[in-house]
Amino acid sequence: MIKDFDPSEFVGKTPTKIFAFGGIQEVGKNMYGIEYDDEIIIIDCGIKFASDDLLGIDGIIPSFEYLIENQAKVKALFITHGHEDHIGGVPYLLKQVDVPVIYAPRIAASLILKKVNEHKDAKLNKVVVYDDFSNFETKHFKIDFYRVNHSIPDAFGVCVQTPNGNIVESGDFRFDFAAGGEMLDVHKVVKIAERNVHVFMCETTNAEIPGFSQSEKLIYRNINKIIKEARGRVILTTFASNITRINEIIEIAVNNKRKVCLLGKSMDVNVNISRKIGLMDIDSNDIVEVRDIKNYPDRSILILCTGSQGEDSAALNTMARGKHNWVSLKSTDTIIMSSNPIPGNYAAVENLLNELSKYGVTIFENSPNMKLHASGHATQQELQLMLNLVFPRYLIPIHGEYKMMRTIKNIAQECGINGDDVGLLANGQVMYLIDGKLYYSGEVINADPIYIESRNSSPDLARVIKQRQILSREGMFAVIVVFDKNNNILGMPTLITRGCFFALDSSPLMTKITHSIKRGLENVIQNKRFNTREQMIKELKRVCKETVSYFIWKNKSRNPLISTVLSWV
């Protein structure tokens, strides 16, 4: 049973601290910390994609405040694999925290190097590539790894031996015994379990899905069938990070005597990096530039593109809008959607499919009758298998929303793990591991989300987002008042409204607001005394705002963003 920490019971004991900067009670921005005495190691540093209501925001990363405050303790960052929700925050971390070394698998290391090169103010000290056989030590920690099967090659779980017990972080994983390729290293997991795993931090993304997930082998078979039977061009979209599937699709295309055209920056980048480090063996003669596809018969072309999530600027959406410079859709085209919409993208994907349908193209989506996508995350029986292999003393669910975390607690109980030994945490909540036992410490670090806009990150963006959300819902109302040097109001205040209500249809209300503002301001100037000019301006703005707010709420039931401009001539 996980108990509350009582300091009086552990005088002179130094705990191993376990906490999440992000990734708990959410899907995205995975980042976890393990601390002992004067050392902190970090596992992953990801980004979370912004929902539609976060207007103008490109992504969300964890707060690095705790690491900035404890800079001297930071010893290393360990990356489990190269997906954005695990590496997307790295350049922003390196702008604020001096990380001595980053340990990462091959493809993740290459992707990180490229990302950092795009952020000139990010300081990268050293990147060390690790594999299945790597071992690293700091003063207090011993770290090694086990390979997992995921939707990107070179994916790993991380094992950390600490003075108070052993911690395993699962990474993203699944079991796929049929597809071949990189298998989850069951033998290594068993060896790690023999050490006694005190805390298992396990991903929960697909914890609500029963059974075993579909094998990629079935996905390849179905894609091959569609490509083989297509009489025109095939346009296939999938996640650009799903390197394993992309490699297989290219092989299928070549076997069906089709040239492959890569469209979309992330698709092009990921394939080129994979070829460079030897994860893909592709003959350059099988790849064609988009400007050259017109020189080939339609049935000899497969376009592999971005846009599976309905992204506005992605290649497939550009085609659907008829705006692509080189590709115009035809009724003879076959579109394959080898993906599922991630939460928040359903509407965008449906809009994309509707636009594509207007061209009369043939569209294949992932469905129970035609499996074209398999998740890279463990479902219920796979989680049971992993829990039985590791059989930890304590379980901390990560990488999932609360309901997913709650579900894996039930799964763990079926595997013989006591429900009281499962810690359902929040980001920032610190657990103490002492002599192999886990405690709720009561300590909390800052884990506020930090918003990214045009590669800039700042806590202040939260206020900007709130203003944008008010603007989108309630509109804006501006008051402009001009005074002479004796503080007399010149003329009447000017009112401007945008997105709040139509001013021409509300002339009596606008007149009432104008006169009320003028009377209120004159009353302030005539009857109040101020020590400073700043105090007077603050009071004048307050009167303007409260007057506008009162009348608009009373008459329109709106609460717009109110801006006041006062000037003296």
UniProtKB/Swiss-Prot annotation:
The protein's Enzyme Commission number: 3.1.-.-
The keyword RNA-binding appears for this protein: yes
Record function comment: An RNase that has 5'-3' exonuclease and possibly endoonuclease activity. Involved in maturation of rRNA and in some organisms also mRNA maturation and/or decay.
Subunit structure: Homodimer, may be a subunit of the RNA degradosome.
The protein's name in its UniProt record: Ribonuclease J
Binding-site residues for Zn(2+) 1, renumbered to this chain: H81, H83, H150, D172
Binding site for Zn(2+) 2: D85, H86, D172, H399
CDD domains: RNaseJ_MBL-fold
Residues that coordinate or bind substrate: H373, A374, S375, G376, H377
Family: Belongs to the metallo-beta-lactamase superfamily. RNA-metabolizing metallo-beta-lactamase-like family. Bacterial RNase J subfamily.
Biological process, per Gene Ontology: rRNA processing
Record localization: Cytoplasm
Segments traversing the membrane: none
Domain of life: Bacteria
InterPro entries found in the cross-reference section: Metallo-B-lactamas, RibonucZ/Hydroxyglut_hydro, RMMBL, RNase_J, RNase_J_2, RNase_J_b_CASP, RNase_J_bac, RNase_J_C
A Pfam family annotated for this UniProt entry: RNase_J_C
Gene Ontology CC terms, in alphabetical order: cytoplasm
Cofactor(s) listed in the protein's UniProt record: Zn(2+)
Chief subcellular location: cytoplasm
Note on how the cofactor is bound: Binds up to 2 Zn(2+) ions per subunit. It is not clear if Zn(2+) or Mg(2+) is physiologically important.
GO function term, MF aspect, one: RNA binding
Keywords of the record: Cytoplasm, Endonuclease, Exonuclease, Hydrolase, Metal-binding, Nuclease, RNA-binding, rRNA processing, Zinc
